[in-house]
Amino acid sequence: MALAAGGAPVAALDLDGASAEETANLITKAGGKAKAFQGDTSKAADVDRAVSGAVAALGPLEIMVNNAGILDGYFNVDEIDEALWRRVIDIDLTGVFLGSKRALADMLPRGRGRIVNMASVAGLNGTGGGAAYVAAKHGVVGLTRQMAVVYSSRGVTINAVCPGPILTDLRRHSQAILGPGVPDMSGRGIAVSDEQVRSVVPAGRRGTVEDIASAVCYLASEEAGYVTGHTMVVDGGWRAK
């Protein structure tokens, strides 16, 4: 929505097709251009179909935001099974690889583009999630930096946003995607309660989706043309402590 408010046409790819349609409808009702696609970001065919459809409907791909992600139930290595490990890695890391690879296929021939990957403060330390989530987000940070080194000279900037505690439905959405084999995540993790947030976040509150959207919009803008390979931490000062 924030990118659309700035004048960008937006294509939304979501496993929940209704959610993608809702986003596209909100944008078009506000006077913007949008297209919705249902698909799995961890499957190359779905990503290719969505990007190809978006380019056909909306024009050249200028910005790719790899935002899909799920939690892992906060399982440690001795608790998580291989199936859950692979599913989390597929969505949280392989999805970023696939989205970036498909975006580069359009951006590199034109010599311009912006890729913004959603990482996490869990990708910068050993807390903030279970084993699979922390490993995947570290992978996103590393992949972002490697791609920036390789492709920035060809006109494509590549950065990551690392949110701290944010007011979202990520726990509930993760639960719905992963199914009943994952424990209730509503009370698990760091900074679950308001009291915990105040104790670990100097700003004294959770962040909002608008806080994250502002960071994404900056990294996607012309003003950020010399910013690449950067991990922008948006955590209310959590990691500064």
Question: What residue ranges belong to the model's regions?
Answer:
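Active-site helix of classical SDR
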Residues: 100, 136, 144
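Canonical Rossmann dinucleotide-binding motif of NAD(H)/NADP(H)-dependent dehydrogenases/reductases
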Residues: 1-11
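Substrate-binding pocket helix/loop in short-chain dehydrogenase/reductase
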Residues: 75-77, 81-89, 115, 197
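Residue(s) in the substrate-gating loop at a strand-loop-helix junction
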Residues: 120
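Short C-terminal tail/terminal secondary-structure segment
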Residues: 71-74, 125, 216-217, 228-241
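Short, small/polar-rich loop/turn modules that mediate ligand/substrate recognition or access, typified
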Residues: 152, 157, 227-229
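Alpha-helical segment proximal to the catalytic Tyr-Lys
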Residues: 105, 149-150, 225
